[in-house]
Amino acid sequence: MRTNPTTSRPGVSTIEEKSTGRIDQIIGPVLDVTFPPGKLPYIYNALVVQSIDTANKQINVTCEVQQLLGNNRVRAVAMSATDGLMRGMEVIDTGAPLSVPVGGATLGRIFNVLGEPVDNLGPVDSSATFPIHRSAPAFIELDTKLSIFETGIKVVDLLAPYRRGGKIGLFGGAGVGKTVLIMELINNIAKAHGGVSVFGGVGERTREGNDLYMEMKESGVINEKNIEESKVALVYGQMNEPPGARMRVGLTALTMAEYFRDVNKQDVLLFIDNIFRFVQAGSEVSALLGRMPSAVGYQPTLSTEMGSLQERIASTKKGSITSIQAVYVPADDLTDPAPATTFAHLDATTVLSRGLASKGIYPAVDPLDSTSTMLQPRIVGNEHYETAQRVKETLQRYKELQDIIAILGLDELSEEDRLTVARARKIERFLSQPFFVAEVFTGSAGKYVGLAETIRGFQLILSGELDGLPEQAFYLVGNIDEASTKAITLEEENKSKK
């Protein structure tokens, strides 16, 4: 039987001592509960319904108080299915908000919104729990220094660098390498920063969540034989779960990440897939609670709910939480209130391109569409900024010339444009990189490339020093020295074929 951290953690008085109420009304996932006078629970308190249904099966439903209605009644939203509940059933006020296990014991495990393990690996050996509703760090605790969060991925570090303690939007459809990019980031932060990661699956497909778990085990991000050596904790609230669970699962994942930042003083990577589903679940709950909808049917508290989640993701003097959030854009409408509210919080955007993926260039990050507020001379320095701008200019010129090349051919271009195209094609291939987590699939050893090495490599291509090397030499290599070595190998192979 699963142990609920909210009701079983140390310091929580036994259920018999708590105030009890009765279910008055059930409308889908929303319960109205009547309590004795003077015994009303607070907003966000967890309520538990423990009973037997008509089929003689055990019911254990946790709810969260959302409204105080008057006449000793409260309205709560269920975190699991309300099947089998009946009016008149007893409801226990736990006297505290939902609390979840935190710390090293959560690594390598899968949890639901209540912090209960759902991976059949037994209970979690963690005495520490945190409530999921917490305040954002105080102004005095925030680290205001703007610093780059080095990922070891060339295209990200050079053209759309991440901010330490920042928020990044990850835009990508199915099959363009989003999962592999996520796993590589989890792997690299563990190796380069000694950090850990938390993955929050908010309203995602159960199949995708299972696939991610299996791929993480295959690539070593989750160490099945020695679970303590795993680098990530997973928290899932899938599409089939009630809106209350999908609305709160992001906070559960964030709470686990906050412990690593505040207590263990680590750099944490927090993935939220998908932030749109968080908004969507909030919209459903808002309608169920009877609030008047706002623009496009969204909840009137959209900005407040988004802000309360996003403001907790910050860099403090103890450590940092850097968040990468997958953003679904409904009907590709960027003015839709859900993505528009999300954009206001983002420091960088990483756009994955199907066109690049079809060319076999991985990671398929679009170098022209991806942006970052960190790419400024005063933050990254003149050398980095100028190199990035020249790379973008070269790629942009190549993009403009592609139509002419398709119609008239490469020979019709001027000498200068032919040189630009040759360098752009080398740059495009040099932006690809072998990943550690893809070693088992590709047979190529993964590469972590430091920022200084990345800048040096692109400067050499732009300066024309490597014009004599074939473009294949730049494909799927780490630093620029490997490209030179690969060119020699390719030349020897060609000679031996002749």
UniProtKB/Swiss-Prot annotation:
Q: Which Gene3D superfamilies match?
A: 2.40.10.170, Bovine Mitochondrial F1-atpase, Atp Synthase Beta Chain, Chain D, domain 3 (1.10.1140.10), P-loop containing nucleotide triphosphate hydrolases (3.40.50.300)
Q: What is its EC number?
A: 7.1.2.2
Q: Which SUPFAM superfamilies match?
A: C-terminal domain of alpha and beta subunits of F1 ATP synthase, N-terminal domain of alpha and beta subunits of F1 ATP synthase, P-loop containing nucleoside triphosphate hydrolases
Q: A biological process (GO) annotation for this entry?
A: proton motive force-driven mitochondrial ATP synthesis
For this protein, what reaction is catalysed? ATP + H2O + 4 H(+)(in) = ADP + phosphate + 5 H(+)(out)
Q: Which keywords belong to this entry?
A: ATP synthesis, ATP-binding, CF(1), Chloroplast, Hydrogen ion transport, Ion transport, Membrane, Nucleotide-binding, Plastid, Thylakoid, Translocase, Transport
**Domain of life of the organism in this record?**
Eukaryota
CDD domains in alphabetical order: ATP-synt_F1_beta_C (cd18110), ATP-synt_F1_beta_N (cd18115), F1-ATPase_beta_CD (cd01133)
Provide the primary localization.
Answer: plastid
Query: Would you name any one GO CC term?
Result: proton-transporting ATP synthase complex
Write down the membrane topology. Peripheral membrane protein
A single GO molecular-function term is: ATP binding
Cell compartments where the protein resides: Plastid, Chloroplast thylakoid membrane
Q: Which top-level enzyme class is recorded in the Swiss-Prot or TrEMBL entry?
A: translocase
Q: Which residues bind ATP?
A: G172, G173, A174, G175, V176, G177, K178, T179
The similarity comment for this entry is:
Belongs to the ATPase alpha/beta chains family.
Subunit: F-type ATPases have 2 components, CF(1) - the catalytic core - and CF(0) - the membrane proton channel. CF(1) has five subunits: alpha(3), beta(3), gamma(1), delta(1), epsilon(1). CF(0) has four main subunits: a(1), b(1), b'(1) and c(9-12).
What does this protein do, in the record's words? Produces ATP from ADP in the presence of a proton gradient across the membrane. The catalytic sites are hosted primarily by the beta subunits.
The protein depicted here goes by the name ATP synthase subunit beta, chloroplastic
Q: Which organism is it from?
A: Lolium perenne (Perennial ryegrass)
